[in-house]
Amino acid sequence: MIIEVTARHFNVPDYIRDYAEQEVQKLKKFNDRITRCQVLLSHEHNQHTAELNLSFPGQRFHSKVSTENLTKSIDTAMTKMEHHLRKYMGKLQKHY
């Protein structure tokens, strides 16, 4: 899986970059065919936004969260992404 961590309007500290990459690695347990995950971090007016764009063959998922804390934004976006993946994997299992 290719993981890209990008920041808008600020430079990402290494510990935040490592934290985001570590959290994204946890998504492999849902589907091992994940090919790419983009983590877009931005900061505007005391709001930190974390956006996750996840793709694997034939499917794309997106989650976006804004909070006052960057790590909290990453955690909440990850929770939303896990929910999307659980729902999708449940639908796949029902059809097969």
What are these regions (language model features)?
Residues 1-96:
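N-terminal, polar/charged subdomain of small-to-medium soluble alpha/beta proteins
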